[in-house]
Design a protein with these regions (language model features):
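Helix-turn-helix
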Residues: 57-91, 95
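Basic, helix-initiating cap at the start of DNA-binding domains
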Residues: 2-61, 68-74
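Amphipathic alpha-helical packing segments from all-alpha helical-bundle domains
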Residues: 152-175, 184-196, 212-220
Length: 244
């Protein structure tokens, strides 16, 4: 990634699928009184502060215990200002979630393109995702743990995002499924298992150690397609994926 942290960019609403780079963390507070700033700047500044506040508050309290009042207090904005930008807490969370998910998708795609073969692409994409989640524990919790607890539209959106990973794995079927066709639920099962392991580590406060899971996860993913021996060899390879 470019200079700055992904956490700051995501919390300020700066992460874009086509622009995974990020600026500095802190969102400046507007001075009180008549400041003479353009309305568009004020509006964007407020929105970024609200998203920043949501990420911080959800990391501290969890989604279900977080209220609009908590968010507005942390963002130093009024309830009226909050509702000018978001219909409710769920809409605010979804805005933050989508920015993080878009960033992860773009970073994984860029990493995969550095390799010509599908198995190496899978490894590079997974390594990039784990590195991002390990470096941004608040965002890791936001996009991997809280959606399940939140339920409703947030959980549905999260399930849809996980289907992106299912499609990545299904792309390897034509060349790597062997003589016997794989069960239809193979990719769903693999992604579900990987997500469960990642969520377990994040929930236990071990986000910083997520990259240690890479060899085991790569072997788990590739074994049905390549066989245990080849999957283990690729899992232990020191091939360096592109930076996120």
């Amino acid at each position: 990634m470019a200079k700055g942290t992904a956490k700051g960019a995501a919390k300020r609403g700066k992460i874009k699928a086509e622009e995974p780079a990020s600026p500095a963390d802190a969102s400046p507070r507007l001075p009180a009184g008549r400041h003479g700033l353009p309305r568009e700047f004020i509006t964007q500044n407020q929105r970024e502060r609200i998203i920043t506040a949501l990420v911080d508050t959800v990391a501290e309290r969890g989604y279900n215990a977080t209220t609009v009042a908590h968010i507005t207090k942390a963002a130093s904005v009024s309830r009226r200002t909050f509702y000018e930008h978001f219909a409710d807490k769920e809409a605010c969370f979804l805005a933050a979630y989508e920015m993080v998910a878009d960033h992860i998708r773009a970073s994984m795609g860029a990493a995969a393109k550095s390799f010509g073969e599908w198995p190496q692409q899978v490894r590079a994409a997974l390594a990039t995702m784990l590195r991002f989640l390990a470096s941004e524990p608040e965002l890791a919790r936001l996009c991997m743990v809280e959606p399940v607890a939140a339920g409703g539209e947030i959980a549905a959106r999260h399930r849809a995002t996980m289907q992106d990973f299912v499609r990545i794995l299904k792309a390897g079927r034509p060349e790597h499924s062997g003589e016997r066709p794989l069960p239809e639920a193979t990719e769903e099962t693999l992604v579900g298992g990987i997500v469960s392991l990642i969520v377990r580590e994040i929930s236990a406060g071990r986000s910083a150690e997520l990259e240690k899971l890479l060899p085991d996860l790569v072997e788990l993913i590739l074994s049905p397609y390549l066989g245990t021996e080849e999957a283990e060899r690729l899992a232990r390879t020191d091939a360096a994926p592109t930076a996120d």
